[in-house]
Amino acid sequence: TMGEETVAELQIPDVDDVVKGVEALDVDAGDDVDEHDADLAPQAAGGAPSSVNMSPADAKVEAVALIDDDRLLQAARLLRRHAVDVPIANPLDATDAKLNAFVPKAAVMEDLIASLKADPKTPGTEWLVQCEHSGRRDVSIYYRMDNETQTKLTARIESPIHKDMLVPFLSVLNESELYKSWLPNWTMPRLRVRRSDKLSQTGRCSQVVLVTVDLPWPFSSRECVLDAWGVDDIDASGDICVLVDSMKPGESMRCGSIVPDVDESGVVRIDFEAGFLFRKLPGGWEAERDAARAAASWFGTSGSSGTSKGGEGANDSRRSSLDEEGHSDDGHHAESSPGDQILVSVQMYMDPKLSYVPTSLLNFVIRTVLYTMWCMLLRVAEQVRDGKSESHQKSIREKSTELYDWVRERTGAMLARLFAGGNVVTA
């Protein structure tokens, strides 16, 4: 069964109005970030001016200010530029302690971003193609298994979305307490999200969430405590990033609270790590998609290509159903110009803490669960965009001043930067 929300109107400002109002940076937004140029971004954003002559002490203070403004990656670049090594061996004050707590996460995020920006089809990457589905929602899924255990899964999912989906998508990700209302559940085999509780709001766009998932018999339920960090790297690279990392019992959250022990007998805590990346659709994406569609049409695979194996009939039917569900959305079309689109990518690693994973369960997760959950996420974001999710509408309204007004302003700056030079297309 899948949770459905009541229909209500949600007023989201027109993206182009936000873009035009921001009048953001008149620069090209490439993927490569010059450390010196990135260092100057705080001045444009209202922070203290940067200087090549800044002392290490001043660099640390400025880095903390950047962290407080959700610009962790810029803080890490600033510290590297001024030769401040983190972790700091002998922290002297609260500034040092904060840098030690936050900055190491930047390296993890940078590695994930580098992986997400690399072509998964490059020889030697070990990615296997699960599906490259072309339709109203373009979805590409890749995966690889740990060679030693064959139980640890790394998956990568990519979809281009229209620019007016950016704020709704981010809001659905942020509203973790509503996950249980829309994430799909299965009875055969049993797989469902039973609990999604926010333990702490640790920052403007950072939180700690407890998620419990029931697995098929004879496996016990699994859960993880997820520390999610939203990072604004718009002024430096044009990107928005989210890092999700599991926490262990007894660890301290950034708010000072302690991660609790498992509160149910038989439930097993697992390891999970993920990174979301929102960036301009790379050049050539459309051509590759069209080529995949042409190949799929030639071989009669109805718009889906990849390593589909036996038993995929039900999955293909489900994919078709998910794809068709969205066609009732008035005023929104399947085709978009590359100048309208943002590429959303996520890479996730999970260790289920199992000595053996049956092939049937593994195939179910790889072939069905990942695709269905991703399409449901896109579908709910579409509902939010169209004002059709009362629960999300209520949360967005309640958090406008503290969060969503800022999200709209920053995403407006991102879109203006990415589509500068008169390439912003009216929605």
What are these regions (language model features)?
Residues G3-A427:
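Eukaryotic helix-grip
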